[in-house]
Design a protein with these regions (language model features):
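N-terminal auxiliary segments of SAM/dcSAM-dependent transferases
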Residues: 1-37
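SAM-dependent methyltransferase
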Residues: 4-5, 12-21, 163-226
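Conserved alpha-helix/loop element of class I SAM-dependent methyltransferases that forms part
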Residues: 54-74
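Conserved SAM-binding loop of SAM-dependent methyltransferases across substrates and taxa
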Residues: 82-93
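Conserved SAM/SAH-binding beta-strand->alpha-helix loop
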Residues: 102-103
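Conserved SAM-binding strand-loop segment of SAM-dependent methyltransferases
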Residues: 113-124
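A short SAM/SAH-binding and catalytic strip from SAM-dependent methyltransferases
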Residues: 131-151
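A short glycine-rich, Lys/Arg-flanked "PGG" loop and its adjoining helix->strand segment in the class I
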Residues: 150-163
């Protein structure tokens, strides 16, 4: 799986910001760029500042800083995007492989100086080897898309994780968004998990395809991980119903 360059708003926004920033003498984060628009049939339209995707460790939330602090060994950064986490880890002296399905994001990462960038899907069998730390941050469970596909995601992570390895993954329990239980029952169709969401990104005149994204509460992640033969540990709870979890064998 790969993303068409002409339908990749996030990749276009990141590459434009990185290219512009390389010729800008002002400190990082000080140059204004048009934000990414985030559309969803389930929520109000939102905006994501491009600078957020290029943030430094000091600008990261506690959950992300904690994940960087406890990363070790050979590291795989999945869905790397800009990728602020890969760059921070590389600057800390770690060996990092950054992967993304967006060719524009991969170009941006190379421009930022990340040494090992691969334009490849996590599920592509050409991605082989064993990693000590696998990072899936900025709602890492989202990659699964739907709850029914979460076991497949965890199974793939097991294949490429070293015996002494760890998966560091974050997500959020978004039940609070829907109000009380009665509101939730009236909004979410029967048989559908409330954390299954559809999004679409827009940057300037570039409109991406609608995609599925999954938020998972910790108790459910723990249950599914156990069914896949993995241990699931809560590392840190955030202030916005979010959390960082560690999966091990």
């Amino acid at each position: 799986m790969t993303i068409d360059k002409n339908k990749d708003p996030m990749g276009a926004a990141i590459l434009e910001a990185v290219t512009s920033r390389q010729g800008d003498r002002r400190p990082r984060g000080h140059k204004h760029h048009e934000p990414l628009r985030v559309l969803s049939p389930m929520f109000e339209d939102d905006e994501l500042p491009v600078s957020h995707l290029l943030r430094t460790p000091d600008e990261m939330p506690e959950i992300e800083r904690k994940a960087l602090d406890i990363s070790y060994g050979k590291i795989l950064d999945v869905g790397a995007g800009a990728r602020c986490h890969s760059l921070a880890l590389q600057e800390m002296g770690h060996e990092v492989t950054a992967i993304d399905i967006s060719p524009l994001c991969c170009e941006a990462m190379e421009r930022r100086g990340i040494k090992d960038v691969r334009h490849v899907d996590l599920f592509d069998k050409s991605l082989s080897g064993k990693f000590n730390t696998i990072l899936l941050l900025m709602n890492g469970t989202g990659i699964a898309g739907r709850l029914s596909r979460l076991p497949s995601l965890l199974g793939r992570l097991k294949e490429i994780m070293a015996d002494d390895g760890q998966v560091l993954i974050d997500s959020s329990d978004i039940k609070y968004v829907y109000g009380d239980e009665d509101d939730l029952a009236s909004i979410i169709p029967e048989g559908k998990y409330y954390g299954e969401v559809e999004f679409q990104m827009v940057y300037k005149d570039i409109r991406g395809k609608q995609f599925e994204w999954l938020y998972v509460d910790f108790a459910l992640l723990e249950t599914i991980a156990k069914s896949c033969g993995m241990k699931c540990e809560m590392i840190l709870e955030g202030a916005q119903h979010d959390y960082l979890a560690r999966l091990t064998l």
